[in-house]
């Protein structure tokens, strides 16, 4: 069985790491490179960096920090933010990232997934999906341009249909960002992730809701995800990654110590 992955997420805005709640009211957490280094030293399996306003600002992720991160960490990392072309992706991979993640640009042009996976291989291509559960309609909806509250759109896609679509186009991995749970630290959305797992045949990463160690054990055991992504619990030092991994081992979760 493949080891489950613990993945700190660093949302980047104006060159600094920030964190919001339900994709709003972002506060500055700190500088990119020292945080990346700290998480690598604590035992993170990989890191994900989201330049959260790149797509809504119609620009590509700022590459200057990508190479600085590559110099100081020896674990895989993934970069997202406004990647719309093969050249955008190539530059980020050349700067040292192991994977690129696309979200809003894939919704605007789904064939981008095909082109990127054919050029770089599916192992490099991660699709981020921002999923919102509408309590009134009972529907799971995919949102676009979520880095900017004023620009955010509800797309035509049902979350689970979009999961199927991106896989058919060459997604090598899917990160499901559950917007309702983001930053509130009350646990992952096990129900939605279980439904996603049923239609997802590539690695599935849970994102949104981690608040305590038991939440990680629950999402691995109940939703059978391949990785758990979290931000605020690590940024605010509520949970230490080394201690989390030791705990998961006691819960019979396959993990790299």
Swiss-Prot record:
- Any one GO CC term of the record: cytoplasm
- What are the protein's GO molecular function terms? imidazoleglycerol-phosphate synthase activity; lyase activity
Where does the UniProt annotation locate this protein? Cytoplasm
Where, by residue number, is the active site?
Answer: 11, 130
SUPFAM superfamilies xref list: Ribulose-phoshate binding barrel
UniProt-listed InterPro entries: Aldolase_TIM, His_biosynth, HisF, IGPS_HisA/HisF, RibuloseP-bd_barrel
Superkingdom to which the source organism belongs: Bacteria
Catalysed reactions, semicolon-separated: 5-[(5-phospho-1-deoxy-D-ribulos-1-ylimino)methylamino]-1-(5-phospho-beta-D-ribosyl)imidazole-4-carboxamide + L-glutamine = D-erythro-1-(imidazol-4-yl)glycerol 3-phosphate + 5-amino-1-(5-phospho-beta-D-ribosyl)imidazole-4-carboxamide + L-glutamate + H(+)
Q: Which GO terms describe its biological process?
A: L-histidine biosynthetic process
Task: Give the chief site where it resides.
Answer: cytoplasm
The entry sums up its family as follows: Belongs to the HisA/HisF family.
Under the subunit heading, UniProt states: Heterodimer of HisH and HisF.
Name of the protein: Imidazole glycerol phosphate synthase subunit HisF
Q: Which organism is it from?
A: Psychromonas ingrahamii (strain DSM 17664 / CCUG 51855 / 37)
């Amino acid at each position: 069985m493949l080891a489950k992955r613990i993945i700190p997420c660093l949302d980047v805005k104006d060159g600094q790491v920030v964190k919001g709640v339900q994709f709003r009211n972002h506060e500055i957490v700190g500088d990119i490179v020292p945080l990346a280094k700290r998480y690598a030293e604590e035992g993170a399996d990989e890191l994900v960096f989201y330049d959260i306003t790149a797509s809504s600002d119609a620009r590509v992720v700022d590459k200057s920090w990508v190479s600085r991160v590559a110099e100081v960490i020896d674990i895989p990392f993934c970069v997202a933010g406004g990647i719309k072309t093969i050249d955008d992706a190539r530059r980020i991979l050349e700067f040292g990232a192991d994977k690129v993640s696309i979200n809003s640009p894939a919704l605007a042009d789904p064939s981008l997934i095909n082109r990127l996976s054919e050029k770089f291989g599916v192992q490099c291509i991660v699709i981020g999906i921002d999923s919102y559960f509408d309590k009134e309609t009972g529907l799971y909806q995919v949102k676009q341009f979520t880095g900017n509250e004023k620009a955010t759109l509800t797309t035509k896609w049902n979350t689970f249909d979009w999961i199927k679509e991106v896989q058919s186009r060459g997604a090598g991995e899917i990160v499901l960002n559950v917007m309702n749970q983001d930053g509130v630290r009350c646990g992952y959305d096990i129900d939605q992730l279980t439904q996603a797992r049923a239609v997802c045949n590539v690695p599935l990463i849970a994102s949104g809701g981690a608040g305590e160690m038991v939440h990680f054990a629950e999402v691995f055991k109940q939703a059978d995800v391949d990785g758990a992504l979290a931000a605020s619990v690590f940024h605010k030092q509520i949970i230490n990654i080394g201690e989390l991994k030791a705990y998961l081992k006691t819960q019979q979760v396959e993990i790299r110590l």
